[in-house]
Amino acid sequence: MTKSGGRPFEVVVYGDEDSVLYHSLTSPIPALPQPEPSFDVTISKNSQPKGADLLMRNIVIVTINPKTFSRTSVKYERDVYAKNQIVIYVGSPSVSQLRKDMTTSSVITDLLTRQEMGAMVATLKDKHNPKMEETVRRMFGIEMRIPSDMKSCKEGKDFVWISNNSPTSMTNICIYTSENRDSVMRKNIKGETDNMYMTTNKESVISSIAKTQDRQVTVRRGLWEMKGDAMGGPFVSHTLHDIAGHKTLTIECFVYAPGTKKRNTLMRTEASLMTVKAAGR
């Protein structure tokens, strides 16, 4: 079977009357500096995928039929036409019913997000940095995949900062044994002077509970700023409890990419956070 293709977070939708799915899937991602859509959506004029579209990684097929559906239904299959592909089937008795259900349900967005994050985690299996991973294992007793381009490292007390040091799209991973982000960052990530240091825009932070690697994780998404300097960007942190001998362990990624879109860069870096597990497990 041929491997599926498409850009990250690209979705092709079929049968989307009145652009209901389009509006749902292009809603802005929270906690980014500028609005960016959840997905890059292409609406096909066809009712079913044909030709090259059969190889797309993310496909959504919508059917509106009151004789077939008494309520909105969402089902999915994997690897229908190509490897590493998801095809989501959405059925509803009417466009108005579908629109109502899409405003209260995130099931389709969640399915597609898991699909894309899974693809990014799979990429890390082939392109990662064993040297930095050994540093993380030595300091914190955990295993995780670090992107291959992250070659710069700064160690502190119960803290490590790993970065690709790119001047245009800097991606970073920090690990520390605390939930108090501001105190850790003020001590470890400074600007040109001691009066410049990283802080959190507290009004931007969104917290949720997720499950990864069979553990409950507190996920925080928000915006960081550099006090005393015109720098900032998005961050995502995963806080775990009672792992590898640590009462609390936070693994965070943040991005500094002025003047560019940040969704894909942040998500690609966040994939590393989803690979964390206690060493030896």
Where are these regions (language model features)?
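Secretory pathway targeting signatures of secreted, lumenal, and periplasmic proteins
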Residues: 2-4, 10-16, 23, 147-197, ...
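N-terminal "mature-domain start" segment
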Residues: 2-8, 17-19, 23, 35, ...
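Acidic/His-rich structured neighborhood in mature extracellular/periplasmic domains
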Residues: 111, 115-172, 176-177
